[in-house]
Amino acid sequence: VDHYTYCILGDGCQMEGVSNEACSIAAHWGLGKLIALYDDNHISIDGDTDIAFTEDVDKRFEALGWHVIWVKNGNNGYDKIRAAIKEAQAVKDKPTMIKITTTIGFGSPNKSNSYSVHGSALGAKEVEATRQNLGWPYEPFHVPDDVKKHWSRHTPQGASLESEWNAKFAEYEKKYPEEAAELKSIITGELPLGWEKALPTYTPENPGDATRNLSQQNLNALAKVLPGLLGGSADLASSNMTLLKSSGDFQKNTPEERNVRFGVREHGMGAICNGIALHSPGLIPYCATFFVFTDYMRAAMRISALCEARVIYVMTHDSIGLGEDGPTHQPIEHLASFRAMPNILMLRPADGNETAGAYKVAVQNLKRPSVLALSRQKLPQLPGTSIEGVEKGGYVISDNSSGNKPDVILIGTGSELEIAAKAGEVLRKEGKGVRVVSFVSWELFDEQSKEYKESVLPSSVTARVSIEAGSTFGWGKIVGSKGKAIGIDRFGASAPAGKIYEEFGITVEAVVAAAKELI
Protein backbone atom coordinates (compact mmCIF):
# COMPACT_ATOMS: atom_id res chain seq x y z
CA VAL A 1 0.00 0.00 0.00
CA ASP A 2 2.84 2.35 -0.80
CA HIS A 3 1.88 2.80 -4.44
CA TYR A 4 1.30 5.91 -6.52
CA THR A 5 -2.00 6.76 -8.20
CA TYR A 6 -1.84 7.94 -11.80
CA CYS A 7 -4.65 9.85 -13.48
CA ILE A 8 -4.98 10.62 -17.20
CA LEU A 9 -6.57 13.99 -18.03
CA GLY A 10 -7.64 15.57 -21.30
CA ASP A 11 -8.59 19.11 -22.22
CA GLY A 12 -12.26 18.29 -21.68
CA CYS A 13 -11.52 16.98 -18.18
CA GLN A 14 -9.96 20.31 -17.30
CA MET A 15 -13.15 22.12 -18.27
CA GLU A 16 -15.44 19.97 -16.10
CA GLY A 17 -16.34 21.34 -12.68
CA VAL A 18 -15.76 18.04 -10.91
CA SER A 19 -12.07 18.09 -11.84
CA ASN A 20 -11.61 21.42 -10.09
CA GLU A 21 -13.47 20.14 -7.01
CA ALA A 22 -11.28 17.05 -6.83
CA CYS A 23 -8.02 18.82 -7.64
CA SER A 24 -8.73 21.51 -5.06
CA ILE A 25 -9.19 19.06 -2.21
CA ALA A 26 -6.32 16.82 -3.40
CA ALA A 27 -3.97 19.76 -2.92
CA HIS A 28 -5.54 20.62 0.44
CA TRP A 29 -4.89 17.07 1.59
CA GLY A 30 -1.33 17.14 0.25
CA LEU A 31 -1.71 13.94 -1.78
CA GLY A 32 1.91 13.61 -2.84
CA LYS A 33 1.35 10.19 -4.40
CA LEU A 34 -1.24 11.46 -6.86
CA ILE A 35 0.22 12.15 -10.29
CA ALA A 36 -1.96 13.48 -13.12
CA LEU A 37 -0.75 13.25 -16.72
CA TYR A 38 -2.52 15.91 -18.77
CA ASP A 39 -2.71 15.30 -22.53
CA ASP A 40 -2.54 18.91 -23.68
CA ASN A 41 -3.50 18.68 -27.38
CA HIS A 42 -5.81 21.72 -27.61
CA ILE A 43 -8.53 19.80 -29.44
CA SER A 44 -12.10 19.11 -28.35
CA ILE A 45 -14.99 17.46 -30.18
CA ASP A 46 -16.27 20.75 -31.60
CA GLY A 47 -12.88 22.12 -32.63
CA ASP A 48 -9.80 23.83 -31.23
CA THR A 49 -10.10 24.46 -27.50
CA ASP A 50 -9.63 28.18 -28.20
CA ILE A 51 -13.36 28.36 -28.93
CA ALA A 52 -14.19 27.81 -25.25
CA PHE A 53 -11.09 27.20 -23.12
CA THR A 54 -8.28 29.75 -22.92
CA GLU A 55 -7.23 29.76 -19.27
CA ASP A 56 -3.68 29.13 -18.10
CA VAL A 57 -4.04 25.61 -16.70
CA ASP A 58 -0.53 25.60 -15.25
CA LYS A 59 -1.18 28.70 -13.16
CA ARG A 60 -4.56 27.40 -12.03
CA PHE A 61 -3.01 24.19 -10.74
CA GLU A 62 -0.18 26.09 -9.08
CA ALA A 63 -2.80 28.27 -7.39
CA LEU A 64 -4.61 25.15 -6.21
CA GLY A 65 -1.37 23.96 -4.63
CA TRP A 66 -0.10 21.42 -7.15
CA HIS A 67 3.43 20.86 -8.38
CA VAL A 68 3.38 21.45 -12.16
CA ILE A 69 5.75 20.06 -14.80
CA TRP A 70 5.54 20.78 -18.53
CA VAL A 71 6.78 18.30 -21.15
CA LYS A 72 6.73 20.30 -24.37
CA ASN A 73 7.16 17.39 -26.80
CA GLY A 74 4.82 14.62 -25.83
CA ASN A 75 4.72 12.99 -29.27
CA ASN A 76 8.04 11.22 -28.89
CA GLY A 77 9.75 12.81 -25.88
CA TYR A 78 9.64 9.59 -23.89
CA ASP A 79 12.76 10.34 -21.86
CA LYS A 80 11.33 13.71 -20.81
CA ILE A 81 8.06 12.08 -19.75
CA ARG A 82 9.95 9.43 -17.79
CA ALA A 83 12.05 12.12 -16.09
CA ALA A 84 8.91 14.12 -15.27
CA ILE A 85 7.34 11.11 -13.58
CA LYS A 86 10.48 10.59 -11.50
CA GLU A 87 10.42 14.25 -10.51
CA ALA A 88 6.76 13.94 -9.54
CA GLN A 89 7.48 10.88 -7.40
CA ALA A 90 10.08 12.87 -5.50
CA VAL A 91 7.53 15.53 -4.49
CA LYS A 92 6.02 14.23 -1.26
CA ASP A 93 3.84 17.04 0.07
CA LYS A 94 1.59 17.89 -2.88
CA PRO A 95 0.10 16.24 -5.97
CA THR A 96 1.74 16.76 -9.35
CA MET A 97 0.29 17.59 -12.74
CA ILE A 98 2.50 16.75 -15.70
CA LYS A 99 1.27 18.71 -18.70
CA ILE A 100 2.30 16.82 -21.83
CA THR A 101 1.77 18.80 -25.03
CA THR A 102 0.89 16.44 -27.86
CA THR A 103 -0.53 16.44 -31.37
CA ILE A 104 -3.82 14.61 -31.56
CA GLY A 105 -3.73 11.93 -34.26
CA PHE A 106 0.07 12.16 -34.37
CA GLY A 107 1.39 10.43 -37.49
CA SER A 108 -1.81 10.73 -39.49
CA PRO A 109 -0.84 12.70 -42.61
CA ASN A 110 -4.30 14.15 -43.25
CA LYS A 111 -6.10 14.22 -39.90
CA SER A 112 -3.51 14.97 -37.22
CA ASN A 113 -4.13 18.08 -35.13
CA SER A 114 -7.79 18.20 -36.18
CA TYR A 115 -11.00 17.69 -34.25
CA SER A 116 -12.16 15.14 -36.83
CA VAL A 117 -9.83 12.59 -35.23
CA HIS A 118 -11.07 13.26 -31.69
CA GLY A 119 -14.17 11.11 -31.69
CA SER A 120 -14.03 9.26 -35.01
CA ALA A 121 -12.01 6.40 -36.42
CA LEU A 122 -9.31 7.25 -38.96
CA GLY A 123 -10.76 4.92 -41.58
CA ALA A 124 -8.95 2.20 -43.52
CA LYS A 125 -7.22 4.51 -46.02
CA GLU A 126 -5.95 6.92 -43.39
CA VAL A 127 -4.80 4.06 -41.16
CA GLU A 128 -2.71 2.74 -44.05
CA ALA A 129 -1.33 6.21 -44.75
CA THR A 130 -0.47 6.62 -41.06
CA ARG A 131 1.32 3.26 -40.97
CA GLN A 132 3.45 4.31 -43.92
CA ASN A 133 4.12 7.74 -42.44
CA LEU A 134 5.28 6.22 -39.14
CA GLY A 135 7.29 3.48 -40.83
CA TRP A 136 5.24 0.74 -39.17
CA PRO A 137 5.32 -2.32 -41.48
CA TYR A 138 3.74 -4.84 -39.12
CA GLU A 139 0.36 -6.50 -39.48
CA PRO A 140 -2.46 -5.36 -37.18
CA PHE A 141 -2.04 -6.59 -33.59
CA HIS A 142 1.50 -7.84 -34.24
CA VAL A 143 3.88 -7.18 -31.35
CA PRO A 144 7.53 -6.84 -32.49
CA ASP A 145 10.12 -8.94 -30.67
CA ASP A 146 11.92 -5.97 -29.11
CA VAL A 147 8.63 -4.77 -27.62
CA LYS A 148 7.89 -8.26 -26.29
CA LYS A 149 11.33 -8.41 -24.74
CA HIS A 150 10.90 -5.02 -23.08
CA TRP A 151 7.45 -5.93 -21.79
CA SER A 152 8.20 -9.49 -20.64
CA ARG A 153 10.93 -8.40 -18.22
CA HIS A 154 8.28 -6.75 -16.08
CA THR A 155 6.70 -10.10 -15.17
CA PRO A 156 9.65 -11.40 -13.09
CA GLN A 157 10.25 -7.88 -11.75
CA GLY A 158 6.65 -7.70 -10.56
CA ALA A 159 6.82 -11.17 -9.03
CA SER A 160 9.97 -10.19 -7.15
CA LEU A 161 8.40 -6.99 -5.83
CA GLU A 162 5.31 -8.90 -4.72
CA SER A 163 7.46 -11.49 -2.95
CA GLU A 164 9.37 -8.75 -1.15
CA TRP A 165 6.14 -7.07 -0.07
CA ASN A 166 4.65 -10.35 1.18
CA ALA A 167 7.79 -11.07 3.19
CA LYS A 168 7.68 -7.59 4.68
CA PHE A 169 4.00 -8.03 5.54
CA ALA A 170 4.66 -11.43 7.17
CA GLU A 171 7.29 -9.80 9.38
CA TYR A 172 4.89 -6.97 10.21
CA GLU A 173 2.17 -9.52 11.03
CA LYS A 174 4.40 -11.19 13.62
CA LYS A 175 5.25 -7.90 15.33
CA TYR A 176 1.81 -6.29 15.10
CA PRO A 177 -0.84 -9.03 14.76
CA GLU A 178 -3.87 -6.82 15.50
CA GLU A 179 -2.86 -4.06 13.09
CA ALA A 180 -1.97 -6.63 10.43
CA ALA A 181 -5.36 -8.31 10.78
CA GLU A 182 -7.07 -4.96 10.35
CA LEU A 183 -5.03 -4.13 7.26
CA LYS A 184 -5.70 -7.57 5.81
CA SER A 185 -9.45 -7.14 6.31
CA ILE A 186 -9.33 -3.85 4.41
CA ILE A 187 -7.38 -5.46 1.56
CA THR A 188 -9.60 -8.56 1.32
CA GLY A 189 -12.95 -7.02 2.28
CA GLU A 190 -13.76 -9.75 4.78
CA LEU A 191 -16.19 -8.40 7.37
CA PRO A 192 -15.54 -9.16 11.06
CA LEU A 193 -17.56 -12.08 12.39
CA GLY A 194 -20.75 -10.84 14.03
CA TRP A 195 -20.29 -7.22 12.94
CA GLU A 196 -24.05 -6.79 12.51
CA LYS A 197 -24.54 -7.30 16.26
CA ALA A 198 -23.18 -3.79 16.73
CA LEU A 199 -26.31 -2.35 15.09
CA PRO A 200 -28.67 -0.84 17.69
CA THR A 201 -32.24 -2.10 18.07
CA TYR A 202 -35.26 -0.14 19.18
CA THR A 203 -38.69 -0.71 20.73
CA PRO A 204 -41.84 1.43 20.53
CA GLU A 205 -41.07 2.54 24.09
CA ASN A 206 -37.86 4.24 22.95
CA PRO A 207 -38.19 7.97 22.29
CA GLY A 208 -38.90 9.03 18.74
CA ASP A 209 -36.18 10.70 16.73
CA ALA A 210 -35.35 11.93 13.25
CA THR A 211 -33.91 9.14 11.13
CA ARG A 212 -30.89 11.38 10.42
CA ASN A 213 -30.10 11.20 14.16
CA LEU A 214 -30.72 7.46 14.22
CA SER A 215 -28.38 7.21 11.24
CA GLN A 216 -25.62 8.83 13.28
CA GLN A 217 -26.16 6.29 16.05
CA ASN A 218 -25.78 3.48 13.54
CA LEU A 219 -22.72 5.01 11.87
CA ASN A 220 -20.96 5.37 15.21
CA ALA A 221 -21.88 1.84 16.25
CA LEU A 222 -20.54 0.43 12.98
CA ALA A 223 -17.35 2.50 13.15
CA LYS A 224 -16.36 0.55 16.27
CA VAL A 225 -16.39 -2.79 14.42
CA LEU A 226 -15.68 -1.82 10.79
CA PRO A 227 -12.20 -0.24 10.58
CA GLY A 228 -12.67 0.52 6.88
CA LEU A 229 -15.73 2.72 7.43
CA LEU A 230 -14.95 6.37 6.74
CA GLY A 231 -16.65 9.37 5.23
CA GLY A 232 -18.26 12.71 5.74
CA SER A 233 -20.45 15.44 4.38
CA ALA A 234 -20.38 18.25 1.83
CA ASP A 235 -20.15 20.95 4.52
CA LEU A 236 -23.33 19.75 6.25
CA ALA A 237 -22.04 17.33 8.89
CA SER A 238 -23.98 19.02 11.69
CA SER A 239 -27.20 18.75 9.67
CA ASN A 240 -26.60 15.34 8.09
CA MET A 241 -25.40 13.97 11.45
CA THR A 242 -22.47 12.08 9.96
CA LEU A 243 -19.68 12.77 12.44
CA LEU A 244 -17.86 9.75 13.86
CA LYS A 245 -17.41 10.74 17.49
CA SER A 246 -14.46 8.43 18.12
CA SER A 247 -12.41 9.87 15.24
CA GLY A 248 -10.84 13.16 14.31
CA ASP A 249 -10.67 14.83 10.92
CA PHE A 250 -8.85 13.28 7.99
CA GLN A 251 -6.35 15.99 7.06
CA LYS A 252 -2.88 16.33 5.60
CA ASN A 253 -1.21 15.76 8.96
CA THR A 254 -3.78 13.30 10.34
CA PRO A 255 -4.38 10.74 7.55
CA GLU A 256 -5.26 8.05 10.08
CA GLU A 257 -8.55 9.77 11.00
CA ARG A 258 -11.92 8.89 9.46
CA ASN A 259 -14.06 12.05 9.37
CA VAL A 260 -13.68 13.44 5.86
CA ARG A 261 -14.45 17.13 5.37
CA PHE A 262 -15.38 17.30 1.69
CA GLY A 263 -16.38 20.96 1.66
CA VAL A 264 -19.10 22.18 -0.70
CA ARG A 265 -18.09 19.73 -3.41
CA GLU A 266 -20.98 17.30 -3.90
CA HIS A 267 -19.90 15.94 -7.29
CA GLY A 268 -16.28 15.64 -6.20
CA MET A 269 -17.38 13.99 -2.95
CA GLY A 270 -19.24 11.25 -4.81
CA ALA A 271 -16.35 10.71 -7.21
CA ILE A 272 -13.84 10.51 -4.34
CA CYS A 273 -16.00 7.93 -2.57
CA ASN A 274 -16.08 5.87 -5.76
CA GLY A 275 -12.29 5.88 -5.78
CA ILE A 276 -12.13 4.83 -2.14
CA ALA A 277 -14.62 1.99 -2.65
CA LEU A 278 -12.86 0.70 -5.77
CA HIS A 279 -9.41 0.90 -4.16
CA SER A 280 -9.95 -1.86 -1.59
CA PRO A 281 -12.93 -4.12 -0.89
CA GLY A 282 -12.66 -3.45 2.85
CA LEU A 283 -12.96 0.31 2.57
CA ILE A 284 -16.57 1.40 3.09
CA PRO A 285 -17.00 5.08 2.22
CA TYR A 286 -20.11 7.08 3.03
CA CYS A 287 -20.95 10.62 2.03
CA ALA A 288 -23.78 12.95 2.88
CA THR A 289 -25.73 16.00 1.86
CA PHE A 290 -29.38 17.03 1.61
CA PHE A 291 -31.30 14.61 -0.61
CA VAL A 292 -32.22 17.36 -3.07
CA PHE A 293 -28.52 18.09 -3.65
CA THR A 294 -28.00 14.68 -5.21
CA ASP A 295 -28.75 16.68 -8.36
CA TYR A 296 -25.20 18.05 -8.05
CA MET A 297 -23.64 14.59 -7.80
CA ARG A 298 -25.91 12.29 -9.79
CA ALA A 299 -23.19 11.51 -12.36
CA ALA A 300 -20.91 10.18 -9.61
CA MET A 301 -23.75 8.14 -8.12
CA ARG A 302 -24.51 6.63 -11.51
CA ILE A 303 -20.83 5.68 -11.82
CA SER A 304 -21.09 4.00 -8.39
CA ALA A 305 -23.89 1.84 -9.75
CA LEU A 306 -22.16 1.21 -13.07
CA CYS A 307 -18.84 0.29 -11.44
CA GLU A 308 -20.46 -1.81 -8.70
CA ALA A 309 -18.91 0.40 -6.01
CA ARG A 310 -20.16 0.00 -2.44
CA VAL A 311 -20.70 3.64 -1.54
CA ILE A 312 -23.23 4.56 1.14
CA TYR A 313 -25.05 7.80 0.29
CA VAL A 314 -26.51 9.31 3.46
CA MET A 315 -29.17 11.74 2.21
CA THR A 316 -31.06 13.69 4.83
CA HIS A 317 -33.91 16.22 4.68
CA ASP A 318 -35.67 13.76 2.41
CA SER A 319 -39.08 15.40 1.87
CA ILE A 320 -41.34 18.41 2.40
CA GLY A 321 -40.98 17.48 6.07
CA LEU A 322 -37.83 19.60 6.23
CA GLY A 323 -40.13 22.62 6.44
CA GLU A 324 -39.40 26.29 5.88
CA ASP A 325 -36.39 25.98 3.54
CA GLY A 326 -39.02 25.52 0.87
CA PRO A 327 -39.12 24.02 -2.62
CA THR A 328 -35.45 24.58 -3.49
CA HIS A 329 -34.55 22.18 -0.69
CA GLN A 330 -37.51 19.80 -0.81
CA PRO A 331 -36.94 16.69 -2.93
CA ILE A 332 -39.95 15.57 -4.96
CA GLU A 333 -38.81 13.48 -7.95
CA HIS A 334 -35.66 12.11 -6.36
CA LEU A 335 -36.96 8.86 -4.91
CA ALA A 336 -38.49 7.91 -8.25
CA SER A 337 -35.36 8.84 -10.17
CA PHE A 338 -33.07 6.64 -8.07
CA ARG A 339 -35.54 3.77 -8.21
CA ALA A 340 -35.22 4.03 -11.98
CA MET A 341 -31.41 3.81 -11.87
CA PRO A 342 -30.01 0.28 -12.35
CA ASN A 343 -27.91 -1.42 -9.66
CA ILE A 344 -28.50 1.04 -6.87
CA LEU A 345 -30.49 0.47 -3.68
CA MET A 346 -32.90 3.23 -2.70
CA LEU A 347 -33.76 2.82 1.00
CA ARG A 348 -36.19 4.99 2.96
CA PRO A 349 -36.38 3.83 6.59
CA ALA A 350 -39.18 4.86 8.91
CA ASP A 351 -37.58 4.54 12.36
CA GLY A 352 -34.63 3.19 14.32
CA ASN A 353 -34.97 -0.49 13.44
CA GLU A 354 -35.40 0.29 9.77
CA THR A 355 -32.43 2.66 9.79
CA ALA A 356 -30.31 -0.10 11.32
CA GLY A 357 -31.65 -2.48 8.68
CA ALA A 358 -30.77 -0.03 5.93
CA TYR A 359 -27.17 0.12 7.16
CA LYS A 360 -26.98 -3.66 7.38
CA VAL A 361 -28.15 -3.91 3.77
CA ALA A 362 -25.75 -1.18 2.63
CA VAL A 363 -22.72 -2.84 4.21
CA GLN A 364 -23.64 -6.32 2.98
CA ASN A 365 -24.13 -5.28 -0.64
CA LEU A 366 -20.56 -5.36 -1.92
CA LYS A 367 -21.42 -4.78 -5.58
CA ARG A 368 -23.82 -1.86 -5.49
CA PRO A 369 -24.23 1.50 -3.80
CA SER A 370 -27.04 2.37 -1.41
CA VAL A 371 -28.93 5.63 -0.95
CA LEU A 372 -30.48 6.21 2.48
CA ALA A 373 -33.23 8.86 2.47
CA LEU A 374 -33.53 10.19 6.02
CA SER A 375 -35.87 12.61 7.75
CA ARG A 376 -35.17 15.91 9.42
CA GLN A 377 -38.33 15.68 11.52
CA LYS A 378 -38.80 13.45 14.56
CA LEU A 379 -40.54 10.12 13.91
CA PRO A 380 -41.85 7.52 16.40
CA GLN A 381 -40.40 4.07 16.92
CA LEU A 382 -43.14 2.00 15.32
CA PRO A 383 -44.44 -1.41 16.41
CA GLY A 384 -43.66 -4.20 13.97
CA THR A 385 -40.59 -2.76 12.27
CA SER A 386 -37.45 -4.87 12.07
CA ILE A 387 -33.98 -5.13 10.61
CA GLU A 388 -34.95 -8.43 8.99
CA GLY A 389 -37.96 -6.84 7.33
CA VAL A 390 -35.80 -4.19 5.70
CA GLU A 391 -33.66 -6.92 4.15
CA LYS A 392 -36.78 -8.06 2.28
CA GLY A 393 -37.46 -4.57 0.95
CA GLY A 394 -41.15 -4.67 1.87
CA TYR A 395 -42.87 -6.43 4.76
CA VAL A 396 -46.01 -6.44 6.89
CA ILE A 397 -45.81 -4.44 10.13
CA SER A 398 -49.43 -5.00 11.19
CA ASP A 399 -52.47 -6.95 9.98
CA ASN A 400 -55.80 -7.75 11.60
CA SER A 401 -57.13 -9.78 8.66
CA SER A 402 -56.94 -13.52 8.10
CA GLY A 403 -56.29 -15.84 5.17
CA ASN A 404 -54.08 -13.32 3.37
CA LYS A 405 -57.25 -11.44 2.41
CA PRO A 406 -57.26 -7.96 3.96
CA ASP A 407 -59.92 -5.49 2.85
CA VAL A 408 -57.22 -2.95 2.07
CA ILE A 409 -53.43 -2.69 2.09
CA LEU A 410 -51.80 0.57 3.20
CA ILE A 411 -48.22 0.94 1.96
CA GLY A 412 -45.93 3.55 3.48
CA THR A 413 -42.27 4.49 3.28
CA GLY A 414 -40.10 6.50 5.63
CA SER A 415 -41.89 9.26 7.50
CA GLU A 416 -45.22 8.30 5.92
CA LEU A 417 -45.24 4.80 7.43
CA GLU A 418 -46.48 6.45 10.63
CA ILE A 419 -49.41 7.92 8.68
CA ALA A 420 -50.20 4.51 7.18
CA ALA A 421 -50.10 2.90 10.63
CA LYS A 422 -52.42 5.52 12.16
CA ALA A 423 -54.84 5.28 9.24
CA GLY A 424 -54.86 1.52 9.71
CA GLU A 425 -55.89 1.94 13.34
CA VAL A 426 -58.79 4.20 12.35
CA LEU A 427 -60.05 1.76 9.74
CA ARG A 428 -59.77 -1.22 12.09
CA LYS A 429 -61.93 0.53 14.65
CA GLU A 430 -64.53 0.73 11.89
CA GLY A 431 -64.34 -3.02 11.40
CA LYS A 432 -62.08 -3.16 8.35
CA GLY A 433 -59.39 -5.76 7.78
CA VAL A 434 -56.25 -3.70 7.23
CA ARG A 435 -52.70 -4.68 6.40
CA VAL A 436 -49.97 -2.07 6.79
CA VAL A 437 -46.83 -2.64 4.75
CA SER A 438 -43.49 -0.91 5.07
CA PHE A 439 -41.95 -0.57 1.63
CA VAL A 440 -38.39 0.46 2.43
CA SER A 441 -36.77 -0.61 -0.85
CA TRP A 442 -38.44 -1.45 -4.15
CA GLU A 443 -35.27 -3.08 -5.43
CA LEU A 444 -34.94 -5.50 -2.53
CA PHE A 445 -38.62 -6.40 -2.69
CA ASP A 446 -38.34 -7.10 -6.42
CA GLU A 447 -35.57 -9.60 -5.66
CA GLN A 448 -37.72 -11.70 -3.32
CA SER A 449 -39.45 -14.90 -4.36
CA LYS A 450 -42.84 -14.78 -6.01
CA GLU A 451 -44.27 -16.55 -2.97
CA TYR A 452 -42.91 -13.97 -0.55
CA LYS A 453 -44.18 -11.05 -2.63
CA GLU A 454 -47.60 -12.68 -2.80
CA SER A 455 -47.60 -13.07 0.99
CA VAL A 456 -47.06 -9.32 1.40
CA LEU A 457 -49.06 -7.95 -1.54
CA PRO A 458 -51.54 -10.66 -2.55
CA SER A 459 -52.63 -10.22 -6.15
CA SER A 460 -56.24 -10.84 -5.15
CA VAL A 461 -56.28 -7.63 -3.09
CA THR A 462 -56.59 -4.66 -5.42
CA ALA A 463 -57.57 -2.13 -2.75
CA ARG A 464 -54.15 -0.64 -2.12
CA VAL A 465 -53.10 2.83 -1.01
CA SER A 466 -49.50 4.07 -1.07
CA ILE A 467 -48.40 7.05 0.99
CA GLU A 468 -45.12 8.82 0.25
CA ALA A 469 -44.16 12.51 0.41
CA GLY A 470 -42.72 12.51 -3.08
CA SER A 471 -43.64 11.97 -6.70
CA THR A 472 -46.27 9.30 -7.33
CA PHE A 473 -44.41 8.33 -10.50
CA GLY A 474 -43.92 4.56 -10.56
CA TRP A 475 -46.31 3.73 -7.74
CA GLY A 476 -48.81 2.34 -10.23
CA LYS A 477 -46.54 -0.70 -10.41
CA ILE A 478 -47.17 -1.33 -6.70
CA VAL A 479 -50.78 -0.27 -6.12
CA GLY A 480 -52.11 -1.36 -9.51
CA SER A 481 -54.70 0.27 -11.73
CA LYS A 482 -57.39 -0.03 -9.06
CA GLY A 483 -55.25 1.37 -6.26
CA LYS A 484 -54.49 4.91 -5.13
CA ALA A 485 -51.10 6.63 -4.80
CA ILE A 486 -51.01 9.54 -2.36
CA GLY A 487 -48.01 11.77 -2.92
CA ILE A 488 -46.80 15.07 -4.36
CA ASP A 489 -46.62 15.80 -8.07
CA ARG A 490 -45.67 19.46 -7.85
CA PHE A 491 -42.90 21.40 -6.15
CA GLY A 492 -43.10 21.96 -2.42
CA ALA A 493 -43.58 25.13 -0.39
CA SER A 494 -42.16 26.97 2.58
CA ALA A 495 -44.09 26.12 5.74
CA PRO A 496 -43.70 24.16 8.97
CA ALA A 497 -43.73 20.40 8.38
CA GLY A 498 -47.15 19.77 9.95
CA LYS A 499 -48.79 22.57 8.01
CA ILE A 500 -47.31 21.59 4.66
CA TYR A 501 -48.37 17.95 5.08
CA GLU A 502 -51.95 19.15 5.60
CA GLU A 503 -51.80 21.46 2.58
CA PHE A 504 -50.55 18.66 0.33
CA GLY A 505 -53.11 16.16 1.57
CA ILE A 506 -50.68 13.70 3.10
CA THR A 507 -52.67 13.01 6.23
CA VAL A 508 -54.32 10.18 8.10
CA GLU A 509 -57.72 11.53 7.05
CA ALA A 510 -56.77 11.51 3.36
CA VAL A 511 -55.52 7.93 3.59
CA VAL A 512 -58.66 6.76 5.38
CA ALA A 513 -60.87 8.44 2.77
CA ALA A 514 -58.90 6.90 -0.10
CA ALA A 515 -59.08 3.45 1.48
CA LYS A 516 -62.85 3.67 1.95
CA GLU A 517 -63.29 4.56 -1.71
CA LEU A 518 -61.41 1.41 -2.72
CA ILE A 519 -62.94 -1.11 -0.33
UniProtKB/Swiss-Prot annotation:
Keywords: Calcium, Chloroplast, Magnesium, Metal-binding, Plastid, Thiamine pyrophosphate, Transferase. Mg(2+) binds at D11, N41, I43. Constitutively expressed in leaves and roots. The keyword Lipid biosynthesis does not apply. It comes from Craterostigma plantagineum (Blue gem). InterPro entries: THDP-binding, Transketo_C/PFOR_II, Transketolase-like_C_2, Transketolase-like_Pyr-bd, Transketolase_bac-like, Transketolase_BS, Transketolase_fam, Transketolase_N. It catalyses: D-sedoheptulose 7-phosphate + D-glyceraldehyde 3-phosphate = aldehydo-D-ribose 5-phosphate + D-xylulose 5-phosphate. It is found in: Plastid, Chloroplast. It holds the Pfam family Transketolase_N. This is Transketolase, chloroplastic.
